[in-house]
Amino acid sequence: MPMDEIAATDPVAILREIEESCRVCNTTDSRQAIEIFSEWSGIAFRIGRNRLLAPLDEVVEILDMPKLARVPLAQPWVRGIANIRGNLLPVVDFSGFLGGEVATVTEKTRVLVIDYDGIYSGLVVDEVFGLKHFMESEHADAAPDVDGFLLPYIRNRYRRDGRVWCEFSLFALADTPQFLQTAI
């Protein structure tokens, strides 16, 4: 009996027909191989010439550069404190902290906010490109082409369109004792 006729007559018959269709689809003869791909997602950003990825679960929020209150007697890489919806957010110059050149603030400058093990902090980056997804097949063993001061925090690399993207662990950065030593 065609499905149209069943629908017009008996709802229980409709359910039986659906169940039978599912049974047919699940037989070994009609099964199709399903490939499951492992995907990794991260926030793509830039520090100087370095294009990096932050694991998605390590970034709480991405902000435009907020207004900052200066912190006296702080390291030069401490940009200041921002009031974000009633929460005080210490803002650190990402590159400056790692020994690189202090970032120049432009309209593309963003702040990556982390909240790790009691450390709530913002990291100034030159630019954020957005969310990137990489398949397991895009994992690369190539040596990272990034400034040396970033190397201790590089976890994985992915190749796409001739470019190698390096996964940078913001949590590993926040775990360093120097990150908490903000006073001069």
Where are these regions (language model features)?
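An acidic, low-aromatic, low-complexity terminal/linker signal
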Residues: 1-184
